[in-house]
From Swiss-Prot:
Outcome recorded upon mutating C292S: Does not affect S-nitrosylation. Strongly decreased S-nitrosylation, leading to increased hydrolase activity and autophagic flux. Reduced formation of intrachain and interchain disulfide bonds in response to oxidation
Catalyzed reaction equations: [protein]-C-terminal L-amino acid-glycyl-phosphatidylethanolamide + H2O = [protein]-C-terminal L-amino acid-glycine + a 1,2-diacyl-sn-glycero-3-phosphoethanolamine; [protein]-C-terminal L-amino acid-glycyl-phosphatidylserine + H2O = [protein]-C-terminal L-amino acid-glycine + a 1,2-diacyl-sn-glycero-3-phospho-L-serine
Residues forming the catalytic site: C74 (nucleophile), D278, H280
Identification of the protein by name: Cysteine protease ATG4B
Enzyme class name: hydrolase
Effect caused by changing S262A: Decreased phosphorylation by AKT2
Effect of W142A: Strongly reduced protease activity
Impact reported for C333S: Does not affect formation of disulfide bonds
Coarse class of the protein's main subcellular location: cytoplasm
Stated family: Belongs to the peptidase C54 family.
Length: 393
């Protein structure tokens, strides 16, 4: 199995193509580039995103479960990538760049440690898979974009260093009042006893010397995830321009989705092609050294990223945004409102101030969903299910 996987992955690396020579701008997570004058900057931006792929020979999930996620963990890895981008923006900033063999700040290794393949890392494959069991997903079962978003939201409660407000907008509706209420609420640590002792905290998200308190903050940084279905079996062309504009926003975290049972993390576009990081490469698991230093080169894509036609995108996706401040959120709202002015384009979701009366009013401070709720949402959004709503065809 390993030999076949390695052979397949070697072929995949040989197939990567350079960017096309085009006057079309390249958009990467809110940044605009020119192929002709900024190619090195494009590749540096791509290489600075955390790239999570299949891994093998990690500690068994649940003690007796799988030691590799090859063949089933691609959407989980994409969920890790979009969430890692939120943590990078939170702790390092969007303009931070990774350089091979250059010393990085401690906060970088703290972010990376939160995703290492072991049971005590906040967003590890172990935590995601085991949290998914509580939501009706057996270990080794494929996730849709909504399911992984729901699981990551629950895991974020334990990450008091990042102190994120995670909101998943359901029913294709983003309610501004709900988000403001959530982000202005201080949430105490819910998982202080769920992770190792203080001496191990640096390996799980807390940098050495970090101060973690429950002091109220005027605005907790927002991770906004919006699961969507943009067509029946293919993406509706009327959504394409709106989708492109999502990658232009400075708050963009990208998109998770891809093709049925083959997930990708989309970070931008050029012309009519999406740019993405592909998790379908199996690499050996990485263990931090005694000083919590991580050999990190395998977590960065150092070749031109993959591209695919937007028309090939499976219509089941989740779009992500990060708003570090309330001003960022207000700016994002204004940009979304302007999208309605795009000629011939359909909005992918609705932005409203208050909860519409025809929708049940959720408890926005409830940080978990029961399994029946998750099962209902999963049936609605996951691409493998045929019972879904069609948006504005």
């Amino acid at each position: 199995m390993d030999a076949a996987t390695l052979t397949y992955d070697t072929l995949r690396f040989a197939e990567f193509e350079d960017f096309p020579e085009t006057s079309e701008p390249v958009w990467i997570l809110g940044r605009k580039y020119s192929i002709f004058t900024e190619k090195d900057e494009i590749l540096s931006d791509v290489a600075s995103r955390l790239w999570f792929t299949y891994r093998k020979n990690f500690p068994a999930i649940g003690g007796t479960g799988p030691t590799s996620d090859t063949g089933w963990g691609c959407m989980l890895r994409c969920g890790q990538m979009i969430f890692a981008q939120a943590l990078v923006c939170r702790h390092l900033g969007r303009d931070w760049r990774w350089t091979q063999r250059k010393r990085q700040p401690d906060s970088y290794f703290s972010v990376l440690n939160a995703f290492i393949d072991r049971k005590d890392s906040y967003y590890s494959i172990h935590q995601i898979a085991q949290m998914g069991v509580g939501e009706g997903k057996s270990i080794g079962q494929w996730y849709g974009p909504n399911t992984v978003a729901q699981v990551l939201k629950k895991l974020a409660v334990f990450d008091t260093w990042s102190s994120l407000a995670v909101h998943i907008a359901m029913d294709n509706t983003v309610v501004m009042e709900e988000i403001r209420r959530l982000c202005r609420t201080s949430v105490p640590c819910a998982g202080a006893t769920a992770f190792p002792a203080d001496s191990d905290r640096h390996c799980n998200g807390f940098p050495a010397g970090a101060e973690v308190t429950n002091r109220p903050s005027p605005w907790r940084p927002l991770v906004l995830l919006i699961p969507l279905r943009l067509g029946l079996t293919d993406i509706n062309e009327a959504y394409v321009e709106t989708l492109k504009h999502c990658f232009m926003m400075p708050q963009s975290l990208g998109v998770i989705g891809g093709k049925p049972n083959s997930a990708h993390y989309f970070i931008g576009y050029v012309g009519e092609e999406l740019i993405y990081l592909d998790p379908h490469t199996t690499q050996p698991a990485v263990e931090p050294t005694d000083g919590c230093f991580i050999p990190d080169e395998s977590f960065h894509c150092q070749h031109p990223p993959c591209r695919m036609s937007i028309a090939e995108l499976d219509p089941s996706i989740a779009v992500g945004f990060f708003c570090k401040t309330e001003d960022d959120f207000n700016d994002w709202c204004q940009q979304v409102k302007k999208l309605s002015l795009l000629g011939g384009a359909l909005p992918m979701f609705e932005l409203v101030e208050l909860q519409p009366s025809h929708l049940a009013c959720p408890d926005v401070l409830n940080l978990s969903l029961d399994s029946s709720d998750v099962e209902r949402l999963e049936r609605f959004f996951d691409s493998e299910d045929e019972d879904f709503e069609i948006l504005s065809l």
